[in-house]
């Protein structure tokens, strides 16, 4: 973390490389979010209602409590960790403190609302279908922003270069004398 905090990660090519490759995977995660959503629904509240409540016209059964619980059980830790990772790295980017706090709160709030919206549609009121559509769009925009902002932050000033001869060498510690 000290490399991120003081900006010296720019000189740590392997650290930048691993972070950039992780962001490649998270970009794939972000793209597949769209594919999964649009395979089941579209951006209309009616499609959300049909998916969660079922539709006689389309021969769709309503989502069961058990199936929703299984999806939520895997989504909560995964999405929580993704948002934690992205917002944690954003802490070291050159944004104002107030903006960082807003981005962090928005990221976690949108993730929670997006996950909760399906439950609200299914077990509270079909009127929450608008919440599902809105939070899906907003959360995907937030994920896209975080990934893009971090790529720009990591690419700033230099590009990750890996020297295979020195890749296994540890950086020399600085001589920090107490005053």
Where are the language model's segments positioned?
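N-terminal signal-anchor transmembrane alpha helix
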Residues: 13-43
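Hydrophobic alpha-helical transmembrane segments of polytopic
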Residues: 18-25, 103-111, 135, 139-142
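Aromatic-anchored segments of alpha-helical transmembrane domains
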Residues: 28, 108-119
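Cytoplasmic juxtamembrane regions at transmembrane-helix boundaries
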Residues: 84-107, 170-171, 177
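Perimembrane loop-to-helix junctions flanking transmembrane segments
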Residues: 46-62
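N-terminal juxtamembrane cytosolic/stromal segments of multi-pass membrane proteins
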Residues: 1-15, 167-179
């Amino acid at each position: 973390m000290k490399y991120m905090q003081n900006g010296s990660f720019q000189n740590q090519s392997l650290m930048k490389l691993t972070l950039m490759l992780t962001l490649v995977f998270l970009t794939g995660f972000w793209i597949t979010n769209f594919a999964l959503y649009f395979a089941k629904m579209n951006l209309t509240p009616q499609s959300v209602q049909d998916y969660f409540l079922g539709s006689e016209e389309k021969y769709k059964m309503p989502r069961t409590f058990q199936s929703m619980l299984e999806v939520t059980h895997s989504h909560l830790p995964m999405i929580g960790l993704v948002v934690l990772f992205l917002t944690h790295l954003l802490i070291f980017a050159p944004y104002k403190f107030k903006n960082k706090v807003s981005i962090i709160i928005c990221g976690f709030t949108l993730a929670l609302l997006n996950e909760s919206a399906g439950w609200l549609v299914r077990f509270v009121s079909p009127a929450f279908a608008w919440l599902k559509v809105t939070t899906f769009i907003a959360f995907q925009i937030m994920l896209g922003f975080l990934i893009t902002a971090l790529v720009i932050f990591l690419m700033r000033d230099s590009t990750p270069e890996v020297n295979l001869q020195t890749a296994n060498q540890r950086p020399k510690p600085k001589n920090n004398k107490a005053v």
